[in-house]
Curated annotation (Swiss-Prot):
Disulfide bonds: none annotated. A motif ('HIGH' region) lies at residues 35-45. Its main location: cytoplasm. InterPro entries: aa-tRNA-synth_I_CS (IPR001412), aa-tRNA-synth_Ia (IPR002300), Leu-tRNA-ligase (IPR002302), Leu_tRNA-synth_edit (IPR025709), M/V/L/I-tRNA-synth_anticd-bd (IPR013155), Methionyl/Leucyl_tRNA_Synth (IPR015413), Rossmann-like_a/b/a_fold (IPR014729), tRNAsynth_Ia_anticodon-bd (IPR009080). This is Leucine--tRNA ligase. GO terms for biological process: leucyl-tRNA aminoacylation. The keyword Aminoacyl-tRNA synthetase applies. Transmembrane segments: none annotated. It comes from Rickettsia bellii (strain RML369-C). It is found in: Cytoplasm.
Length: 831
């Protein structure tokens, strides 16, 4: 058994990281984002977990009762795809992966409280979210409607807009199609205002994430008002954030799927083709990127304030049906999208805000004074906005409106491996909730996976049930929850993973909110927003007392590695490649290999570093130390062989230093600078960890190591401070490299464990230097420096500075006219 295995066994036997739900100590809850059990952990994952582990171990040493749990986000498409490939049940693949990944996490020495482990595909977990869903349904926060959805034709499932990347499914890479399907939604929009208003209070979140959430919620204040269609009784209702520019309108733009098209528009082949083209654009981001285009419908609307003015109705590719009303009026002079379209299809550009630029060349989008606008002339844009809305209200055609970019959360997924939605469809009774006594609705074991559609739809018996209300034959809902459902509340379950109800309210009151949540910034507008929404609803259902789940958030950078391709354009693993000179070759067949970009580690591009191989070669501590030392945690880290080798060498030197230290005999020599550095390092390493400057903390500890190393190689050693400094160093390093530091701690003669030892303390008075250096200037130019004793008075400093030979040379016998002293920094002698 090696040192790392030895200490992992001791920690397990001691239940070192299991914590109570009550304590006289202050609590601290640190959590890394719930991982998907993909099968293997690579070194890219290790960085995230290592950051969390340093924080957990440090806060424990600071005297906190620290909750640091782990579990598995185990529903999802990869398990189902593996089941199709291997002709097995997703459960087998998932549980096998969990077992393997749990071993890997334990082998890295992470301080998880495994007694609180959760698994989201366990019926004992998801039965609670099924009940919670029914509570949402009862409150009309969950509903079903037909919706135009993003359909992945390869994975045969619906994708959220956020899961569509450049028009393709985020997992399969297939070109996404648009389809109308009945979908289940959660009314997250009911909470849009609170979600937005609370963002400024998330002061311990990165500004980038707060900004992304604010933009995603996308609050717009404007007006809804109606245009009457010329020669028709129908109207088109538009939403505008700039209704004050109504006199600059030159068209009304509608979404490609606006209902007025089916009702009134004669679909020419050109219109059909344009609609088809628009329907292939998926996600609002894709609409934003697309070149602005439009096609005339043949319809006109009448201007609300001048019946002599008519505006053409244009189908555009930048108006979305699910934002506002699916229709806008276009004012090309003061909106850049409208301007681009107007230029393209030759629409008039009419200026209605004073500008110092030519609106025919580009839209003027700033505020100003209204012109060419009848009763609005001379008003500021803000005054005009209020006035025009008043006029809409007087005419009974419009009102002030707030819109949000945020849409209700579509939670339906047409896949097997997910939590079943607990609803029954009855021809007589409609939608019927599954009774509490019949929860959980579990997935069948006898399923066939042929890669086409949802096996639940095709199961011979599972979906056939009797209606709980009328007892007639009925059908179960065969959609399953989006897997973000499970990860939107799991952090509350850790407070007591054995609770009979969804949460243990008392335990949640103690632990929540999470003090520090650690994960990737890619979750800013999905998981993090959904978790905030769930927490607010759970608060209203009396499951938790908080309304915000995460007090602090830290988003770590990615681990990067070079990519490699062989002569046939196939991706290669790094271990399959060898470098000779400046070229790369395939280890087995000798073929030429092309080195590509340095990118985020990913399975698809095979630029992964296998964790087990690295552990066998260097050990867990060396891996942890490298991923934390080479770059600030919030920045990307490039994996390098030299970096991990350097970390391993440092650990070896620690062991060698320990052997030297214990052989030293006490003496009375004193090195004040070493003593000061010990206290300085304690103070600043603690501050660095608190601020997530972990690489800086490591640099400081290396500096202390070097100082001790230098000291013990002197003829006259300060043994007392060398020994004390080394003991302190081992304590400081423990959160970073826990195995070897526990081992060294024991060899130094300690009978306690480091994992629950107190963090070293420092003496503030020891941080003061006995001397300091001042720059000496003559007439503002540096002429010398001098080391002064801290006890020197101002008069003494001035006198010494004047008499310095280099200063005397430039004074040329003159008396100083003035002496300016900046304490402990600069003295400037003016003559």
């Amino acid at each position: 058994m090696n040192i790392e295995q030895k200490w992992q066994q001791i920690w397990q036997e001691e239940k070192a990281f299991e914590v109570p739900n009550e304590s006289s100590k202050p609590k601290y809850y640190v959590l890394e984002m719930l991982p998907y059990p993909s099968g293997k952990i690579h070194v890219g994952h290790v960085r995230n977990y290592s950051i969390g582990d340093v924080v957990a171990r440090f806060m424990t040493m600071q005297g906190f009762n620290v909750l640091h749990p782990m579990g598995w986000d185990s529903f999802g498409l990869p398990a189902e795809n593996a089941a199709i490939k291997n002709n097995s049940h997703p459960k087998e693949w998932t549980y096998s992966n969990i077992e393997n990944m749990k071993k890997q996490l334990k082998s890295m020495g992470f301080s998880y409280d495994w007694s609180r482990e959760i698994n989201s595909c366990d019926p004992d977990y998801y039965k609670h979210e099924q009940k919670f869903f029914l509570e949402l349904y009862e409150r009309n926060l969950a509903y079903q409607k037909e919706s135009l959805v993003n359909w992945d034709p390869v994975d045969n499932t619906v994708l959220a807009n956020e899961q569509v990347v450049d028009g393709r499914g985020w997992r399969s890479g297939a070109i996404v199609e648009k389809r109308y399907l009945k979908q289940w939604f959660l009314k997250i929009t009911n909470y849009a205002e609170e979600l937005l208003n609370e963002i400024p209070n998330l002061t311990e979140w990165p500004e980038a994430v707060r900004s992304m959430q604010e933009k995603w919620i996308g609050k717009s204040v404007g007006a809804n008002f109606r245009f009457k269609i010329k020669d028709n009784e129908d109207v088109i209702e538009v939403f505008s954030t700039k209704p004050e520019t109504i006199f600059g309108a030159s068209f009304v733009g509608i979404a490609f799927n606006h209902p007025i098209i089916e009702k009134l528009v004669s679909k020419t082949p050109e219109i059909e083709n344009f609609i088809a083209k628009c329907s292939n654009i998926t996600g609002s981001a894709e609409f934003d990127k697309a070149e602005k285009e439009g096609i005339f419908t043949g319809l006109y609307v009448v201007h609300p304030f001048d019946s002599n003015i008519t505006l053409p109705v244009v189908i555009t590719n930048f108006v979305l049906m699910d934002y506002g009303t699916g229709a806008v009026f276009g004012c090309p002079a003061h909106d850049q999208r409208d301007h681009e379209l107007a230029v393209k299809i030759n629409l008039p550009i009419k200026q209605v805000i004073e500008a110092d630029t030519d609106v025919q060349k580009a839209a003027y989008t700033e505020d100003g004074i209204i012109i060419n606008s009848g009763f609005l002339n001379g008003l500021s844009t803000n005054e005009a906005k209020q006035r025009v809305i008043e006029e809409f209200e007087k005419l009974g055609i419009g009102k002030r409106t707030i819109n949000y970019r945020l849409k209700d959360w579509g939670i339906s997924r047409q896949r097997f491996w997910g939590c079943p939605i607990p609803i029954i469809h009855c021809d007589s009774c409609g939608l019927v909730p599954v009774p509490d006594s019949d929860l959980p609705v579990t997935l069948p074991d006898d399923v066939k996976f042929d890669g086409h559609g949802n096996p639940l739809d095709n199961h011979p018996t599972w979906k056939h049930v009797n209606c709980p209300k009328c007892s007639k034959p009925a059908i179960r809902e065969t959609d399953t929850f989006d897997t973000f459902f499970e990860s939107s509340w799991y952090f509350t379950r850790y407070c007591n993973s054995q609770a009979l109800e969804m949460t243990d309210k008392k335990a949640c009151d103690y632990w929540l909110p999470v003090d520090k949540y650690i994960g990737g910034i890619e979750h800013a507008v999905m998981h993090l927003l959904y978790a905030r929404f769930f927490t607010k609803v759970m608060n209203e259902q009396d499951y938790v007392s908080v309304r915000e789940p995460f007090k602090g958030l830290f988003t770590q950078g990615m681990v990067l590695h070079a990519t490699y391709k062989d002569e046939h354009n196939n991706w290669l693993y790094p271990e399959e490649v060898i470098k000779k000179g400046n070229e790369f070759f395939h280890k087995e067949n000798g073929g030429l290999v092309t080195q590509g970009r340095i990118e985020k580690m990913s399975k698809s591009k095979k630029n992964l570093i296998d964790l087990e191989t690295m552990q066998q070669q260097y050990g867990a501590d060396a891996i942890r130390f490298f991923v934390l030392s080479d770059s600030p945690p919030e920045k990307d880290l490039e994996w390098s062989a030299s970096g991990i080798e350097g970390s391993a060498r440092f650990i070896n030197k620690l062991e060698q230093m320990q052997e030297t230290i214990i052989k030293l005999s006490d003496n009375k020599n004193t090195n004040k600078e070493l003593k000061r550095l010990i206290h300085f390092t304690i103070k600043h390493v603690a501050e660095d960890i608190k601020h997530f400057a972990l690489n800086r903390a490591i640099a400081r500890m290396r500096e202390l190591f070097n100082a001790i190393s230098s000291e013990i190689n002197k003829e006259e050693i300060d043994v007392q401070n060398a020994k004390h400094g080394f003991n302190v160093l081992i304590q400081l390093l423990n959160p970073f490299i826990p195995h070897i530091t526990e081992e060294i701690w024991q060899k130094l003669g300690h009978k306690t464990f480091l994992y629950n030892a107190a963090f070293p303390t420092f003496d503030e008075s020891m941080l003061e230097l006995d001397t300091y250096v001042i720059a000496v200037q003559v007439n503002g130019k540096l002429r010398d420096t001098y080391e002064f004793n801290t006890s020197a008075s101002e008069d003494e400093i001035k006198q010494i500075a004047i008499n310095l030979p280099k200063v005397q040379k430039f004074l040329e016998g003159k008396e100083p006219k003035k002496i300016i002293l900046v304490p402990k920094k600069i003295i400037n002698i003016i003559c």
